[in-house]
Amino acid sequence: MDSSAVPANASNCTDDALAYSSCSPAPSPGSWVNLSHLDGNLSDPCGPNRTDLGGRDSLCPPTGSPSMITAITIMALYSIVCVVGLFGNFLVMYVIVRYTKMKTATNIYIFNLALADALATSTLPFQSVNYLMGTWPFGTILCKIVISIDYYNMFTSIFTLCTMSVDRYIAVCHPVKALDFRTPRNAKIINVCNWILSSAIGLPVMFMATTKYRHGSIDCTLTFSHPTWYWENLLKICVFIFAFIMPVLIITVCYGLMILRLKSVRMLSGSKEKDRNLRRITRMVLVVVAVFIVCWTPIHIYVIIKALVTIPETTFQTVSWHFCIALGYTNSCLNPVLYAFLDENFKRCFREFCIPTSSNIEQQNSTRIRQNTRDHPSTANTVDRTNHQLENLEAETAPLP
């Protein structure tokens, strides 16, 4: 997310990091680097050469120009995250669009997640240039676009992760209802709703974003109505609650209830295979929750601390700030791995994409026929339906080491 687009929150980390400012090596005490160009009117800790990209801390160095090592480290970090994130997410989207058997409700959510994550990581080159030059050279239009993309995709990515958690909870805990609810059509409608909800912050931020000429440099920043401190802090609080606290609670509760349900199914079936499947899915759940928390917690805590106390501008502070931002974006790189590349069906399609053969083409045609027959499932008792949903869930999650 655009570093200045971050209100002290972290798309980003959807993410938060996405909305944080990358403008300065270290954000001003109350600013959000990528997640919210909240600091349109922050003090200028960097001096005349500082650029406040709104909510993201300015990209300017703590004192004078950044050292060569610091600049190279930050640019390398951003470059790796950008390349890996774009490649992984575009590959996920291509495979889902290319292969008919991948057009399931779950994969439609994954497509939406990959789209949001790809757009989020696409803003990193702008943040890198802003950091190196100490000014925003891209004009007002791109300023508005980059900042709004940060917010839009941070929230869309996180909302989609929550949606997938609820979707899997319904599949396991309410298998009968899942037959009607977990359809590709409903998944598309929910994805559209997630983008509309993200507009609640994305559109206002787009109108608030602007460029300002100050001390020989141009800032891409957010402007707030008076009282400035009130609206700035309100944005930070909203981002923190809706982009971090609530998603963590929703994801944790849904997966926790799912594990409890799977345990009860295992006890009823008495199957050792179900026991192994439960352990496998439990590990997957723990990894998903842990990755989200690890990627987004640092930037949120950092922003809160900077809003409460003044942190001296040092090289370490600059690097750590941008590291937190990159960590939030890293979540966008890991999502394809967690939700797609570990899926056996996805890996099979990827192999077919890399090494197409006539047998693969024939297999794809036969898969279309089998999928059509699965659109009319037979009835069964609740335990059998739950076991069936568990088997489907296993197909969507690859075994973790």
Curated annotation (Swiss-Prot):
Fetch the InterPro entries from UniProt. Answer: GPCR_Rhodpsn, GPCR_Rhodpsn_7TM, Mu_opioid_rcpt, Opioid_rcpt
Q: Which residues carry this modification: Phosphoserine?
A: S366, S378
Question: What is the residue range of the motif NPxxY?
Answer: 335-339
State which residue ranges cross the membrane.
Answer: 70-94, 108-132, 144-166, 187-208, 232-256, 281-307, 316-339
Q: How is the polypeptide modified once translated?
A: Phosphorylated. Differentially phosphorylated in basal and agonist-induced conditions. Agonist-mediated phosphorylation modulates receptor internalization. Phosphorylated by GRK2 in a agonist-dependent manner. Phosphorylation at Tyr-169 requires receptor activation, is dependent on non-receptor protein tyrosine kinase Src and results in a decrease in agonist efficacy by reducing G-protein coupling efficiency. Phosphorylated on tyrosine residues; the phosphorylation is involved in agonist-induced G-protein-independent receptor down-regulation. Ubiquitinated. A basal ubiquitination seems not to be related to degradation. Ubiquitination is increased upon formation of OPRM1:OPRD1 oligomers leading to proteasomal degradation; the ubiquitination is diminished by RTP4.
Residue ranges, annotated region (Disordered): 365-388
Glycosylated residues (UniProt): N9, N12, N34, N41, N49
Q: Which GO terms describe its biological process?
A: adenylate cyclase-inhibiting G protein-coupled acetylcholine receptor signaling pathway; adenylate cyclase-inhibiting G protein-coupled receptor signaling pathway; G protein-coupled opioid receptor signaling pathway; negative regulation of cytosolic calcium ion concentration; negative regulation of nitric oxide biosynthetic process; negative regulation of Wnt protein secretion; neuropeptide signaling pathway; phospholipase C-activating G protein-coupled receptor signaling pathway
Which residues are on the Cytoplasmic side of the membrane?
95-107, 167-186, 257-280, 340-401
How is it placed in the membrane, per its record? Multi-pass membrane protein
Q: Give the sites modified to Phosphothreonine.
A: T373, T397
List the keywords (alphabetical): Cell membrane, Cell projection, Disulfide bond, Endosome, G-protein coupled receptor, Glycoprotein, Lipoprotein, Membrane, Palmitate, Phosphoprotein, Receptor, Transducer, Transmembrane, Transmembrane helix, Ubl conjugation
Listed as disulfide-bonded, the cysteine pairs are: C143-C220
* Location in the cell: Cell membrane; Cell projection, Axon; Perikaryon; Cell projection, Dendrite
- Residues with Phosphotyrosine modification: Y169
Q: Which residues form a coiled coil?
A: none
Record-level Gene Ontology MF annotations: beta-endorphin receptor activity; G protein-coupled receptor activity; G-protein alpha-subunit binding; G-protein beta-subunit binding; morphine receptor activity; neuropeptide binding; voltage-gated calcium channel activity
Q: Which residues lie on this side of the membrane: Extracellular?
A: 1-69, 133-143, 209-231, 308-315
Entry's Gene Ontology cellular component terms: axon; dendrite; endosome; neuron projection; perikaryon; plasma membrane; synapse
Kindly name one Pfam family recorded for this protein: 7tm_1
Write out the S-palmitoyl cysteine lipidation residues: C354
The subunit field of the Swiss-Prot or TrEMBL record says: Forms homooligomers and heterooligomers with other GPCRs, such as OPRD1, OPRK1, OPRL1, NPFFR2, ADRA2A, SSTR2, CNR1 and CCR5 (probably in dimeric forms). Interacts with heterotrimeric G proteins; interaction with a heterotrimeric complex containing GNAI1, GNB1 and GNG2 stabilizes the active conformation of the receptor and increases its affinity for endomorphin-2, the synthetic opioid peptide DAMGO and for morphinan agonists. Interacts with PPL; the interaction disrupts agonist-mediated G-protein activation. Interacts (via C-terminus) with DNAJB4 (via C-terminus).
Physiological role: Receptor for endogenous opioids such as beta-endorphin and endomorphin. Receptor for natural and synthetic opioids including morphine, heroin, DAMGO, fentanyl, etorphine, buprenorphin and methadone. Also activated by enkephalin peptides, such as Met-enkephalin or Met-enkephalin-Arg-Phe, with higher affinity for Met-enkephalin-Arg-Phe.
Family in the record? Belongs to the G-protein coupled receptor 1 family.
Q: What is this protein called?
A: Mu-type opioid receptor
Gene name of this polypeptide: OPRM1
